[in-house]
């Protein structure tokens, strides 16, 4: 089989599992899909309710190093609260492939024509094409997921905190060492006003 598209694999690893959990937690499907801005190069992966969620993923069993792609990504001056959602995946034979996860989401939103259309549009924007579904063979299971609220003590660089003259930054943080209130997705969605 051909190597899986890194863009589509990235969508799976970073965002689709969270999207499914949002809908399972009571966020209306269309609202959850409309908030999913990752495929559209949004500053955060989800802008929902009054705030946002940035999804980070690791396959590592130890530690949780997350790559932050800009000074804007963890800036909560525009949207509050802001959560970093850490998702730990494991590649296992009993896991779910990307096409299986997509099929499950399509089934979940099947009764809403607008939601089906929006899901298809976002998947294409993310680089997932159903015609290539046979190429996505890796199976993953979510072993842990947590939402960490970004507050004053959270380690981050923003335009407001970076030294004068710094206009761009890409950096790593260890989510296991980052201070902040840790909750599950449903609690975070409540705090965001999404459910």
Residue positions per predicted region:
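Single conserved hydrophobic/aromatic residue that forms the stacking wall/gate
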Residues: 3-8, 12
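Phosphate-interacting basic helix/loop segments used at nucleotide- and nucleic-acid interfaces
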Residues: 13-16, 26-39
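Conserved catalytic cores of phosphodiester-cleaving nucleases, focusing on short active-site segments
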Residues: 22, 46-59
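Beta-rich nucleic-acid/ligand-interaction surfaces
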Residues: 32-52
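Catalytic cores of nucleic-acid endonucleases
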Residues: 57-120
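C-terminal structured domain segments
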Residues: 117-177
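Charge-rich, low-complexity intrinsically disordered segments
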Residues: 168-195
């Amino acid at each position: 089989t051909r190597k899986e598209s890194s863009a589509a694999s990235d969508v799976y690893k970073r965002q689709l599992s969270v999207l499914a959990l949002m809908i399972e937690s009571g966020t209306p499907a269309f609202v959850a899909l409309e908030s999913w801005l990752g495929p559209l190069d949004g500053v955060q992966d989800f802008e929902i309710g009054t705030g946002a969620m940035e999804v980070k993923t690791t396959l590592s069993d130890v530690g949780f190093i997350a790559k932050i792609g800009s000074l804007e990504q963890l800036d909560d001056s525009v949207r509050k609260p802001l959560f970093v959602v850490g998702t730990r995946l494991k590649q296992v034979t009993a896991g779910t492939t990307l096409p299986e996860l997509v099929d499950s989401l399509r089934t979940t939103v099947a009764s809403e024509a607008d939601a089906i259309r929006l899901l298809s549009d976002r998947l294409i924007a993310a680089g997932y094409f159903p015609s290539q579904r046979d190429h996505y063979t890796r199976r993953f299971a979510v072993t842990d997921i947590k939402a960490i609220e970004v507050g004053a003590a959270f380690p981050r660089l923003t335009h407001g905190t970076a030294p004068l003259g710094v206009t761009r930054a890409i950096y790593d943080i260890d989510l296991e060492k980052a201070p902040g209130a840790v909750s599950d997705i449903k609690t975070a969605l409540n705090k965001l006003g999404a459910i």
